[in-house]
Amino acid sequence: MRIILHVDLDYFYVQVEEVLKPELKGKPAVVGADPQKGHGRGVVSACNYESRKYGIHSGMPISIAFRKCPDCVFLPVNMDLYVETSVRIMQIFRKHADKFELGGIDECYLDVSKRCKSYKQAEELAVKIKSELKNKEKLTCSIGIGPNKLIAKIAANKQKPNGLTAIKPEQVKEFLQKLSVRDLMGVGPKTEAVLNSINIFTIGQLTKVSEASLAEMLGKFGYTLYLEARGVDESPVEESEEIKSIGRQVTFEKDTGDKKLVLEKLQEIVSDVYKTLREYKFAYKTITIKVRYEDFYTTSKAESLKTPHTDEETAQQKARDLIEAFLLDERKIRLIGFTLSKLS
């Protein structure tokens, strides 16, 4: 019997800031660009539950967040702090797992099938993990327990913040029945709209659609969705694929055609990404540059190296080389992004 835990740190960036600044507790707070000094540029990187009451969410333009809640506390992104905290926390989680998979800076999967012979034992372990996290880091997390990664992740999302939800194999069908199709992994606004257009709103309704019909509508993903709707997920918890990529993007205060400014900002974000890479002790093989122009046209370019690299100099040089073609365009640049991937 497989028993998988999905651990999700609650509103991570803001919660870390609250530990350092206890006066933020109970106040709406956002991590992102300064809405006034930055003239409303940039987006919300993270927000606490108090700010969500005003309709603020991650990815929202900072200008809209400010309009929704002018009294919100807006904090700058402190990625070094978040990475350092994440590294410590993941070491706590890792020691409680038979197998451990990092899903991102604020989430992970734990396969506890060997050390936990029942769901009761798994719940006791989850309580222990939550207690250790609170005592050592003064942070909370939400944990989902299930027979696979899919169910564990959905379960973790059902009780936030500081929740604990366990779904046994025999409870999976009933648990999924009334949930929105959006709760399934990989279902975004576009897929949801396609399903809604044929009156499919819940996972229960989705199970009534044939595999062939889903494949016709959604291609290969249709086959995956057919299985997900039935709670089927055979993917293992994999130690080797902890983080698939590390990246950062920045929106300029004003759309710019200043080549020097773009290159300076690129150098800055490459350094930030490299710090994260170094914290996790990774090597990289692929460098990707992303550019968004003033008309919102977005494009990217990548280069893969023959062997893994660990130095910043190569990353900086390749980033400059890749962005050169984009700088020849007459349009002003709104946003640039940099990502390191194929990590090992």
Positions of PLM-derived features:
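Short Gly/Ser/Thr- and Asp/Glu-enriched loop/turn motifs at secondary-structure junctions
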Residues: 103-107, 146-149, 282-286, 331-335
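Hydrophobic alpha-helical hairpins/lids featuring a short glycine-rich hinge
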Residues: 83-141
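Residues that scaffold, gate, or flank divalent-cation-dependent active/transport sites
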Residues: 1-105
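DNA-contacting surface of Y-family translesion DNA polymerases
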Residues: 6, 183, 191-333, 342-343
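Long, highly charged, low-complexity intrinsically disordered interaction regions
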Residues: 120-179
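Short acidic, glycine/serine/threonine-rich loops at helix termini
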Residues: 16-18, 42-45, 151-159, 197, ...
